[in-house]
């Protein structure tokens, strides 16, 4: 079978089949134009990596259901799902999570969920902006951080497993380079929660594989977001082998790959995205 006669799902095509490009991005976009739109649930979508991820998936034709503690901002978030597919939720509130899952399920209305991206995370600082270490972090802060960074991904995955099964979907957990080393700025609770999320990713990959659901993680290093000051960037860049910080768009592209058919045999992985900082 020649390449021109293949549809991009790997089966022999015909003249009536849509002309789907080889790369996963254009393939999804073409399928969406022909009525086969994929759906993504994305937490922490209002800024940084989450915002870049929502934008990329939207450009590829996906329907985006977003979750964040902020109301939907149509000026900053240029995806057509908009307010109708946004769930405003405070993930540190244990009573709010089941309500958020129920609202997402209602909006899915029994349709398949192709990807769940657990991106939301918090990293509290001391009142003076300094790092909270294992001696100075209050118990309430430990509980809040673990609720958002670890428990929320567990509950979203458990609550949406039936919809993920329908699509043989993909889950991507956003961990961090700080889960494997002490960081000068990230607090102890944040770092520990990200290490736990990496471990959880392996556990989930094992448990969800029976349903055809893949579970992976990405571990960003220093990424240029609103919270990274020029002074901090100047401090960090020289110690990174590529001598620069990354961009949210670069992280979003790896997330997209992990949610695509191109990564159909990848599960249980944690992909470092840090310019070689881990080596």
Across the structure, where does each feature detected by a protein language model lie?
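N-terminal structured subdomain of primase-like DNA metabolism proteins
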Residues: 1-36
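Conserved glycine-rich cofactor-binding loop
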Residues: 46-47
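Substrate-binding pocket helix/loop in short-chain dehydrogenase/reductase
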Residues: 127-143, 236
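Active-site helix of classical SDR
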Residues: 157, 193, 201
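Alpha-helical segment proximal to the catalytic Tyr-Lys
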Residues: 162, 206-207, 264
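Short, small/polar-rich loop/turn modules that mediate ligand/substrate recognition or access, typified
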Residues: 168, 209, 214, 266-268
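Short C-terminal tail/terminal secondary-structure segment
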Residues: 181, 256, 267-279
């Amino acid at each position: 079978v020649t390449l021109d006669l293949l549809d991009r799902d790997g089966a022999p095509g015909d003249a009536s089949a849509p002309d789907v490009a080889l790369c996963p991005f254009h393939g999804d976009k073409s399928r969406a134009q022909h009525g086969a739109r994929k759906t993504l649930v994305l937490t922490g979508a209002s800024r940084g990596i989450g915002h870049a991820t929502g934008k990329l998936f939207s450009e590829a034709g996906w329907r985006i259901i977003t979750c964040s503690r902020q109301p939907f901002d149509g000026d900053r978030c240029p995806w057509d799902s908009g307010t109708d597919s946004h769930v405003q939720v405070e993930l540190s509130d244990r009573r709010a999570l089941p309500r958020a899952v129920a609202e997402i399920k209602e909006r899915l209305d029994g349709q398949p969920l192709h990807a769940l991206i657990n991106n939301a995370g918090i990293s509290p600082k001391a009142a003076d902006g300094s790092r909270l270490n294992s001696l100075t972090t209050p118990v309430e802060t430990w509980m809040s951080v673990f609720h958002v960074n670890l428990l929320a991904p567990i509950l979203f995955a458990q609550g949406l497993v039936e919809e993920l099964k329908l699509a043989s979907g993909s889950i991507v957990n956003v961990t961090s380079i700080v889960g494997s080393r002490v960081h000068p700025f990230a607090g102890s609770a944040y770092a520990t929660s990200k290490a736990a999320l990496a471990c959880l990713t392996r556990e989930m990959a094992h448990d969800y594989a029976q349903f055809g659901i893949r579970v992976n993680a990405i571990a960003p290093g220093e990424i240029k977001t609103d919270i990274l000051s020029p002074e901090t960037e100047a401090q960090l860049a020289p110690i990174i082998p590529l001598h620069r910080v990354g961009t949210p768009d670069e992280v979003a592209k790896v997330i997209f790959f992990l949610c695509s058919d191109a990564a159909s045999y990848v599960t249980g992985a944690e992909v470092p995205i840090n310019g070689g900082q881990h080596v």
